[in-house]
Amino acid sequence: MTASSSDGAHGAVDRKLLDILVCPITKGPLEFDAARQELISRGARLAYPIRDGIPIMLPEEARKID
């Protein structure tokens, strides 16, 4: 998984947490999009939101991506 460092402006996510999270659908790696505060699953083509520093790993909460 690739994780960018966060400046805390949008709510920091613990780097260790990002290193262990995987997509709940594909079990594949996630990429951290700091600008959008999302975890991206390329395999599932979904973006999981991060709210108040907490990743919301529910497929029904994820945004579909192209």
From Swiss-Prot:
What Gene Ontology terms describe where this protein resides (cellular component)?
cytosol
Q: Which Pfam families match?
A: Trm112p (PF03966)
Query: Which SUPFAM superfamilies does the entry link to?
Result: Trm112p-like
Q: Which domain of life is it from?
A: Bacteria
The record's annotation in InterPro entries points to: Trm112-like
PANTHER family associated with the record: PROTEIN PREY, MITOCHONDRIAL, ZGC:162634
Q: Which family does it belong to?
A: Belongs to the UPF0434 family.
What's this protein's name? UPF0434 protein RPE_0408
Organism field:
Rhodopseudomonas palustris (strain BisA53)
